[in-house]
């Protein structure tokens, strides 16, 4: 089984234009993501999937590989689907999708997802990660996506709101969704062909498309929290984390 890690990256973020090229400790964010992801064991290859020549030039400048995709991709997974076709991946190849705004991605988190597919082949087509929230302020932050799952670690729902809601207590674990996915190449093509889901459109969370159409998403719990850069002020948080080791 080939394991291909793809990093979708676009320049035109509405909240943070040019985000993948934003410097963090003197190095563009996309380079942090690429270099940390490449430390994961078990990868066959790694590419940045982008529609922007500036991102392409930056990635190739530090020795990374790029696949150029259309600017019309509706979501990161749709961009991944286009990259799969351009790269000629086989149906049973495993695709890891790491967002281009995760400069602190833990390589062992990527390995967790690879191990899930190796231990339970054929039992599911898509998997992702969660992390038990420690900073309680994150629970009510709509930029921090929350998740609930069943006793067999299959996703029930993802939301920008607090889930579950404790009617009589606030003393219970809440899990953050870490924006990293693993799926078979074949399933990515299936996913991309599905119509936009109602819940997906409301929450602006593409993973809900899979749940709305009856597909299972396997969950693994990570020991590390991957800080996403959603706003310019998140850059300073990343630099603080890097300085702390």
Swiss-Prot record:
GO terms for molecular function: 3-deoxy-manno-octulosonate cytidylyltransferase activity. The gene is kdsB. Activates KDO8N (a required 8-carbon sugar) for incorporation into bacterial lipopolysaccharide in the Shewanella genus. Its EC number is 2.7.7.90. The keyword Signal does not apply. Belongs to the KdsB family. Keywords: Cytoplasm, Lipopolysaccharide biosynthesis, Nucleotidyltransferase, Transferase. This is 8-amino-3,8-dideoxy-manno-octulosonate cytidylyltransferase. It catalyses: 8-amino-3,8-dideoxy-alpha-D-manno-octulosonate + CTP = CMP-8-amino-3,8-dideoxy-alpha-D-manno-oct-2-ulosonate + diphosphate. It comes from Shewanella sp. (strain W3-18-1). One of its GO terms (cellular component) is cytosol. InterPro entries: Cytidylyl_trans, KdsB, Nucleotide-diphossugar_trans. It is found in: Cytoplasm. Its main location: cytoplasm. HAMAP family: KdsB. It holds the Pfam family CTP_transf_3. Pathway: Bacterial outer membrane biogenesis; lipopolysaccharide biosynthesis. GO terms for biological process: lipopolysaccharide biosynthetic process.
